Structures are given as C-alpha cells and as structure tokens.
C-alpha cells in the first residue's frame, strides 16, 4: 500500500533512483495505491545527465509493493520493496529498460509496454 509521503525505488532507467509519492490518483477519497495504480511523484534522488532531474513532478505506476496483494485464485504476491516506473505525458514509460520483476496485475490495467520490457512477470 502506497500513500502520500511514501518513498519508492524506481524500477527503470529514466535516471531517477528514489521518488516520493505526493498524490494517489483515482478519486478524491482514494488514500492508498497498490500494484497497477497511477500516482503523482516528485524525484528525490537522480543520477546526473539523465532524462529526469531532481525535483521533477511526474506520474508513475506502482509495479511492486511490500504489502501482499491477493489474487482471484486465492494466491498472494508480495515483494521486498516498493517500486514504480516513471510515466511520460502520454502514459508511456520514460525509460527503455525495466529492472526487476513486475506483477501480472499490470496487464489488466493496460500497461503492456511495461510488461514487454520487464525481465520477469510474476
């Protein structure tokens, strides 16, 4: 579960390393984001000479959460960290590579580009 002020790792090569969630999108009463939800983030750590800079405000999609997620077949999936992939203005990923596994729930949300770039889909 991701909420406002949660620090997430970045799972792509956009140049950002750590981001801070400043808003969960999806309605005025939506407090928590889980896998596949879009959030508004600000970049807290970035590598020099990259596509994104420290202080940039962007959208991102959550690809891994430490909180377990229940699937319809009664299995549970959880990861060691909270991670997100940075999105551009058109909703496409900013980076060209994805690091680490991503959850299968992204396919239902329509993030097929992220699914195809990921090395492993759990």
Curated annotation (Swiss-Prot):
Q: Which GO terms describe its biological process?
A: translation
Name a GO molecular-function annotation: structural constituent of ribosome
Q: Show the Gene3D superfamilies listed in the entry.
A: Ribosomal protein L14 (2.40.150.20)
* Matches recorded under InterPro entries: Ribosomal_uL14, Ribosomal_uL14_bac-type, Ribosomal_uL14_sf
- One Pfam family from the record: Ribosomal_L14
Query: So where does this one cross the membrane?
Result: none
Which Gene Ontology cellular-component terms appear in the entry?
cytosolic large ribosomal subunit
Q: Which UniProt keywords apply?
A: Ribonucleoprotein, Ribosomal protein, RNA-binding, rRNA-binding
Query: Sorted alphabetically, which SMART domains does this protein's record hold?
Result: Ribosomal_L14
Taken from the UniProt record, the cysteine pairs bridged by disulfide bonds within this chain are none
Annotated family: Belongs to the universal ribosomal protein uL14 family.
Its biological purpose: Binds to 23S rRNA. Forms part of two intersubunit bridges in the 70S ribosome.
Mind telling me which HAMAP family this protein's record contains? Answer: Ribosomal_uL14
Q: What is this protein called?
A: Large ribosomal subunit protein uL14
Q: Which organism is it from?
A: Desulfotalea psychrophila (strain LSv54 / DSM 12343)
């Amino acid at each position: 579960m991701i909420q406002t002020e949660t620090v997430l790792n970045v799972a792509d090569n956009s140049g950002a390393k750590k981001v801070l969630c400043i808003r969960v999108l999806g309605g005025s009463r939506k407090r928590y984001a889980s896998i596949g939800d879009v959030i508004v983030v600000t970049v807290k750590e970035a590598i020099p000479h990259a596509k994104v800079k420290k202080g940039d405000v962007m959208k991102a999609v959550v690809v891994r959460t430490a909180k377990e997620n229940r699937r319809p077949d009664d299995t549970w999936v959880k990861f060691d960290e909270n991670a997100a992939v940075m999105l551009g203005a058109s909703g496409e990923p900013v980076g060209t590579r994805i690091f680490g596994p991503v959850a299968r729930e992204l396919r239902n949300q329509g993030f097929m580009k992220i699914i195809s770039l990921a090395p492993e889909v759990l």
